[in-house]
Amino acid sequence: MLPPEARALAKPYFEVLIVDNVNEHQERWLRSNVTRMRRSEDPFVYEALVVPSLEDALVAVLFNHNIQAIVVRPGLVLKSRMDQEIVARFLTRAGGQEEIDNMLPENYGPELCRLVAKVRPELDAYLVTERSVEEIAGLDLGICRRVFYNQEDFMELHLNILRGVQARNKTPFFTALTEYSKQPTGVFHAMPISRGKSISRSHWIQDMGAFYGPNIFLAETSATSGGLDSLLEPHGPIKEAQELASRAFGSKQTFFATNGTSTCNKSVVQALVRPGDIVLVDRDCHKSHHYGMVLAGAQVCYLDSYPLNEYSMYGAVPLREIKHQLLKLKAEGKLDRVRLLLLTNCTFDGLVYNVERVLEECLAIKPDLIFLWDEAWFAFARFNPTYRKRPAIAAAGNPKHTLPSDTPPRL
């Protein structure tokens, strides 16, 4: 393996999945044509993987995270040559197994694009088809970025693949910061640091400069010196970075903060809770939430998690306990004062809630209940097909299947 310094300078590597039922000779032809398109000026390097069926393609995107694009060709078949139990479970859970089994072969490609969108929505798909434009135009193609009609234009496909990956690889704020660090800027708001000059000229702390390197000081910036953007009123690279973060995490909007998770938690609690509101809170939640409740003037009803004695740790708050407290407050005539339910998903020990079920059963008791899910330990879930449906943001984005009201839950 290359050392970190060499890897940082090397071109990023990814893999492209080609789905087509071809023989060994045709597979070599596909791979060689893809390899032949490489150019020295390309920002990335990729290799092609070829699988014959829809089921094989689903297994590949579920378990191979090097795959960043998928090319669906008209020759794909439905079933794998191997028994893929995990795919059968996925299709059953997605509610489409019987429908797919009865599907015409010409619809396998569009259906694969739709299924991949459920497990790896960040991928780009490219559909190669022999069907007419009129037939394709009205179909739901999921993550399909472009359709190629009756052609083998590998260069055009190659350029589209690179363009799609480049769009997801953009780092607007980091790029702006690196450009800013190269400018001959004078700093007057923090004189002791002065872009590292006081360190490089010191007789005593040269080791500090050697440890951190010059870039961390050259990238010194603040709202007073300008040159980048404003966290309070973003309009440039920070705004663009926040928009890309929203797309990555599936949120409506994203805000960056430099105060850490604790201050963010207190800010959210104070924005949602009014003095005198009753709030149901996981007793084991992060301490910043407790501070936020004090600052907001909330009346807290603590919820206890269940013990896991065999592992010497605690689990999550049982749904039965949450419903018991809501019904108890309802019997006391205080349900109208209940404002918010605060839970940690996943817990500090890795236990995950069934968020959709919690939403469904709590909203049946109090339809205007606000849910605050602390998922600081679960940010990775969006990027893993196994956990993708477990974060609160996924449940909020798909309420129509399980929730008793047409109004999406407030999260």
Model-found features: residue ranges?
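Conserved active-site and cofactor/substrate-binding residues in soluble primary-metabolism enzymes
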Residues: R168, P172, L232, G236, ...
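Conserved N-terminal alpha-helix of the aminotransferase class I/II PLP-enzyme fold
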Residues: M1, D207-T263
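Extended low-complexity, intrinsically disordered and solenoidal helical-scaffold regions
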Residues: M1-E5, H25-Q26
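Conserved PLP-enzyme active-site core in the AAT-like
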Residues: E15-N21, R28-N64, V72-G75, K79-E122, ...
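N-terminal capping/interface segment
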Residues: G96-G138, D207-E220, T224-G227
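Beta-sandwich/jelly-roll carbohydrate-recognition scaffolds of carbohydrate-active enzymes
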Residues: A10, V22, E240-Q242
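Ligand/cofactor-recognition surfaces for anionic moieties
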Residues: I67
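Terpene synthase/cyclase
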Residues: V133-Y212, F217, A223
